[in-house]
């Protein structure tokens, strides 16, 4: 079966016989999926250094080559694309008309490690993780790390000075807000767990605690990694891990796993009703229909 059910609660979210459909393949390592207003999926082929587009009628095309080995992507509340780039250690914003603006490159006088994944809050704040993977061979541009920590940052609405929210992760990676944005979930690939924080004014974080632990082996060769993470409209947390996409209830119960044939890098919601999970996994992109919609973010109109 495509879905391993650990709790009856999972059956409300997805059919245990739901098809995990491969919609495209032949890539190097897929990441950063984001559903666009024209009914297409943009995603990164990170080691291949390309950004690609999939459309159900037009197939796969190349959008940017080279892509600065971009990784996580999202859209802001105005529909602009927000992109994490490994080669440039940057977070950039691209308008639908092609205008490109660099939003963050440094913390103080030191270059960011390699921005990895990114979300946008309702007030327009941009929150991103900054592990070191983009300084490793294959994943970005091999070079020495300038910072002595791996953090989570905030770019204020309208710009302004970069704010460091937390700096005690080994390798921060996927992140998502709770439905009311009172909580921020951030996973740590190296420690194979998810932490959750209370969110205060200006997205200051407090009361960090474990939400789910011992998720996989943190082994890059095995692809057994905690990586991308998203939320549904009921507050359940979806995270990549062993065998596919693990689903956790808001109180941290592992409800089950949507099994995917290849190691998964990320996931995101798409289609007009936001009830399809699009899942980049190694050399391919998959999708599965759900019974629940994704948590509605600003761009999900």
Predicted regions and their residues:
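Blade/loop signatures of beta-propeller domains
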Residues: 1-19, 146, 204-205, 296-301
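Beta-strand-rich domains and repeat architectures in extracellular enzymes and scaffolds
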Residues: 2-8, 17-50
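A short beta-strand motif characteristic of beta-propeller blades
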Residues: 19-24, 58-64, 101-108, 160-167, ...
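Beta-rich, blade/repeat-based domains predominating
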Residues: 25-40, 66-85, 89-90, 107-126, ...
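A short loop-to-beta-strand structural motif that recurs across blades of beta-propeller domains
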Residues: 50-52, 90-92, 150-153, 193-195, ...
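Short loop/turn segments immediately following beta-strands, especially the blade-tip
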Residues: 196-205, 289-297
């Amino acid at each position: 079966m495509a879905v391993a059910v650990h709790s009856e609660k999972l059956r409300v979210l997805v059919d245990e016989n739901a098809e995990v459909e491969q919609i495209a393949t032949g890539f190097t390592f897929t990441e950063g999926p984001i559903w666009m207003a024209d009914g297409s999926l943009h995603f990164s082929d990170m080691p291949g250094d390309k950004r690609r587009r999939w459309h159900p009628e037009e197939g796969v095309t190349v959008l940017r080559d080279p892509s600065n080995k971009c990784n996580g992507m999202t859209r802001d509340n105005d529909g602009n694309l927000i992109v994490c780039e490994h080669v440039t250690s940057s977070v950039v914003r691209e308008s639908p008309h092609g205008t490109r603006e660099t939003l963050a490159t440094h913390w103080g006088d030191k270059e960011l490690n390699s921005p990895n994944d990114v979300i946008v809050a309702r007030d327009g704040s941009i929150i991103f993780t900054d592990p070191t993977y983009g300084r490793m061979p294959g994943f970005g541009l091999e070079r020495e790390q300038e910072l002595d920590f791996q953090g989570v940052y905030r770019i204020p609405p309208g710009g302004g000075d970069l704010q460091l929210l937390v700096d005690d992760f080994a390798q921060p990676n996927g992140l998502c807000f709770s439905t009311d944005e009172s909580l921020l979930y951030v996973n740590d690939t190296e420690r194979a767990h998810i932490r959750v924080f209370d969110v205060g004014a200006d997205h200051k974080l407090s009361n960090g605690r474990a939400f789910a632990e011992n998720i996989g082996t943190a082994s890059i060769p095995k692809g057994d990694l905690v990586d991308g993470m998203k939320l549904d409209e009921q507050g359940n947390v979806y995270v990549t891990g062993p065998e596919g996409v693990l689903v956790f209830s808001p109180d941290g119960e592992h409800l089950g796993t949507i099994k995917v044939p290849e190691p998964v890098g990320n996931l995101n919601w798409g289609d007009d009703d936001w009830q399809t999970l699009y899942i980049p996994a190694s050399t391919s992109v998959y999708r599965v229909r759900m019974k629940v919609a994704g948590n509605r973010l600003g761009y999900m109109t």
